């Protein structure tokens, strides 16, 4: 966050924390990630913003509230990916769409993402629907 550059320039930050490692199936990982994002936008960042505001740090409070908005969108993205995974539509659609390789930018139009990118040979997992071309 930009305010840290101004307020903490030349300082040293130390952190000590424990972070759980949860390894599961893709569906389990997406559910866990969505739950984490939910906690961040409903509890964690609003609480941080409240404290910052109470301590007179309005700019920081506003930044934290903005981060909470982004976290809500992250949750929605994870849930949409989970839905596509469960419906078998992650790499397959009922009507043609434009697929983009996230490695090299190759564009392909069709019902399914290619098994491998014909330009860079990366696997299907590197493709996503190119939303630039969606209405």
Which residues does each PLM region occupy?
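Non-heme di-metal
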Residues: 1-135
């Amino acid at each position: 966050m930009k305010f840290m550059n101004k307020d903490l320039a030349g300082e040293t930050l130390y952190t000590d924390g424990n972070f759980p490692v949860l390894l599961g199936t893709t569906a389990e990982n997406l559910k866990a990630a969505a739950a984490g994002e939910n906690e961040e936008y409903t509890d964690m960042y609003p609480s941080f913003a409240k404290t910052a505001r109470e301590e007179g740090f309005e700019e920081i409070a506003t930044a934290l509230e903005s981060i909470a908005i982004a976290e809500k969108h992250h949750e929605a993205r994870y849930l949409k990916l989970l839905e596509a995974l469960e419906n078998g539509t992650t790499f397959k659609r009922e009507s043609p769409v434009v697929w983009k390789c996230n490695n090299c930018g190759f564009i392909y139009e069709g019902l399914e993402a290619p098994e491998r990118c014909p330009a860079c040979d990366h696997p299907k997992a590197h493709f996503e629907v190119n939303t630039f071309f969606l209405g």
